[in-house]
């Protein structure tokens, strides 16, 4: 009987150890913005079980206009995050040791979308206008652009008035702003869907203006990369975006 109990305990210990070895590694991903097509690949990977196949148990946290991903990461609310490089660099300057471990987006989709009736035909026409701009680090490309143009950003007839833009396109629909920030794959089409014709809009792509920056990089805290187990988790997570998993999101 004693031998049986000893064997049973040994078996239980072995089973427990095996379950620990094969338990999925929990990861929390903080998105840059609210749930939208921009992040389709991450949701497709979750829905189709690609993370699970890599031994990862991933939780995706949506962002928003009042959520700063670097703060979430620094506070331990996420293991990795999506962020634009200007925001990440600004956070690093403030003491948050962010490191870019992958760059899924290779070009910028950021643009300013303006009502044609405002008379804006070129960037120099922004003077005296109200511009909707996203904050929490996303404002830096715009501020850099205005600096290059020599246009003040503190209002007045010779400068631009900055409107802190939320997650919708209401400022241009309600004529609270002459231009708003949009992404080529999202907010621009929200404006169109709201009934404004493309012929009634003027669009300025940051890429065309030479002021674009890298967007949607995957960032982690530098000190966590000292952990070999965490490194392995990040490799498994990021490799999904060089595989067929990334292609599946194209049909979404």
Q: Which residue stretches match the model-derived regions?
A:
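Bacterial N-terminal signal peptides that target proteins for export
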Residues: 1-8
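Hydrophobic core
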Residues: 13-17
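Sec/Tat signal peptide C-region and signal peptidase I cleavage site
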Residues: 19-23
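Short, glycine-/small- and polar/acidic-enriched structural segments
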Residues: 25-174, 178-185, 204-206, 212
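Periplasmic-binding protein-like
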Residues: 104-114, 198-227, 234-238
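Conserved small/polar residues in nucleotide/adenosyl-binding loops
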Residues: 241-248
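N-terminal low-complexity segments that are often proline-rich with Ser/Thr-Pro
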Residues: 250-252
């Amino acid at each position: 009987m004693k031998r049986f109990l000893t064997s049973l305990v040994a078996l239980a210990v072995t089973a427990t150890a095996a379950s620990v070895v094969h338990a999925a590694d929990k990861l929390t991903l903080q998105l840059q913005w609210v749930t939208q097509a921009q992040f389709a690949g991450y949701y497709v990977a979750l829905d189709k079980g690609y993370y699970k196949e890599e031994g990862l148990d991933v939780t995706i946290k949506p962002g928003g206009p009042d959520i700063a991903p670097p703060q979430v990461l620094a506070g331990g609310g996420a293991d990795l995050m999506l962020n634009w490089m200007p925001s990440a660099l600004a956070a690093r300057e403030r003491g948050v040791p962010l490191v870019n471990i992958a760059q899924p987006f290779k070009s910028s989709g950021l643009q300013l979308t303006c009502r044609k009736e405002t008379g804006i035909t070129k960037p120099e026409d922004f003077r005296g206008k109200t511009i909707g701009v996203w904050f929490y680090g996303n404002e830096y490309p715009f501020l850099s652009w205005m600096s290059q143009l020599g246009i003040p950003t503190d209002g007045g007839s010779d400068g631009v008035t900055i409107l802190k833009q939320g997650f919708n396109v209401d400022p241009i629909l309600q004529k609270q702003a002459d231009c708003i920030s949009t992404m080529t794959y999202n907010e621009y089409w929200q404006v169109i869907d709201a009934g404004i014709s493309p012929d009634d809009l003027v669009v300025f792509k940051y890429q065309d203006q030479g002021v674009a920056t890298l967007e949607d990089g995957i960032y982690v805290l530098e000190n966590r990369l000292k952990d070999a187990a965490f490194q392995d988790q990040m490799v498994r997570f990021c490799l999904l975006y060089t595989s067929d998993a990334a292609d599946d999101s194209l049909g979404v």
